[in-house]
Structure formats: C-alpha cells, structure tokens
A protein has these predicted regions:
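Acidic/serine-rich, low-complexity amphipathic helices located in mid- to C-terminal regulatory regions
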Residues: 1, 101-147
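C-terminal transcriptional activation/regulatory domains of eukaryotic transcription factors
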Residues: 1-89, 96-106, 133-135
Length: 147
C-alpha cells in the first residue's frame, strides 16, 4: 500500500466532507464516483468504526461513534459504486462493516451484508487461485487473506 497516496486521498476526502460535497445524496461528483481512492477511504472509515466499538468511551458515546463512522463508510462505498465495481478495498471494508454491525446487534443486516460481500468477492475471482495468478504478488497475498 502506498501510504503517501492513502494519506493524500484521506485528506482530500476530509476536505471535501468539510466543504459539504457529500450533503446531497442525489448528486455525486465524478471525482468521488470514479477512481480507487474512495475505496481506501471506505476501508479506513470501516476500520475506525470497528475500533470505536471497542474504545474506552462510555456506552452511548461509543455506540454512536461506531455507528456514525459506519454510516460514513457505507456512504463512501456508495460513492465508490461498490456493487458494480468491487475492489479488494471495498471487499475488506464490507467484511469489517459486517462485523461492526453484528457487534451493534444488527445480526440480520450483517448476515445479508455477508452474502453480498461473498458474491462480490466471487465476482473478483477471489475464490479461485487461477484468476489471481496474473496479479502482483503483494495483491495476491491480500486477495488470499480476504478469501
């Protein structure tokens, strides 16, 4: 993973969020609906949502922080058009989000999300060694860890 690029993507997302670019759910700029960077942001937000669930905050604040970050991660997944263009980042974010919503007591939603995540992973060919052999070694190891 290119940490400098990830940091740049994160700063771009935070600046866009602060500027209100994501307030209108019916209008998504091309900058966020295309490209891989938003998948990285979704993964980061999902990780933060999971981490917030286990933080030292008192229960009401901890739950609210976790849910707020999970909502933002789902929003960035939508911006990444994850159903039509899945990636390793979006698959990983979905797995983390499924665990997070399971921990928040939404087991039915987590079960449905897991089924969707598995189908998206199969779309990428993560279930077969043959389909990932042409990928770079660092990506292959990530794909194997996800499946």
């Amino acid at each position: 993973m290119d940490v400098d690029r990830f940091e740049s993507d994160l700063c771009s997302y935070l600046n866009a969020h602060a500027a209100g670019e994501f307030r209108d759910p019916n209008r998504i700029s091309d900058r966020w609906s295309t490209g891989r960077s938003i998948g990285h942001i979704s993964l980061l937000l999902a990780t933060l949502a999971s981490g917030a669930h286990y933080s030292d905050l008192e229960y009401p604040e901890r739950s609210e922080a976790s849910q707020r970050l999970a909502r933002r991660s789902f929003q960035t997944l939508r911006l990444a058009n994850f159903l039509f263009r899945p990636s390793l980042d979006t698959i990983q974010a979905l797995l983390i989000l499924g665990n997070t919503i399971q921990n928040n007591g939404q087991s039915d939603a987590a079960w449905a999300l897991l089924g969707t995540t598995v189908r998206l992973a199969q779309t990428l060919g993560l279930h077969t060694i043959k389909s990932i052999t042409h990928w770079p070694e660092c990506i292959q190891s990530r794909a194997k860890a996800l499946w």
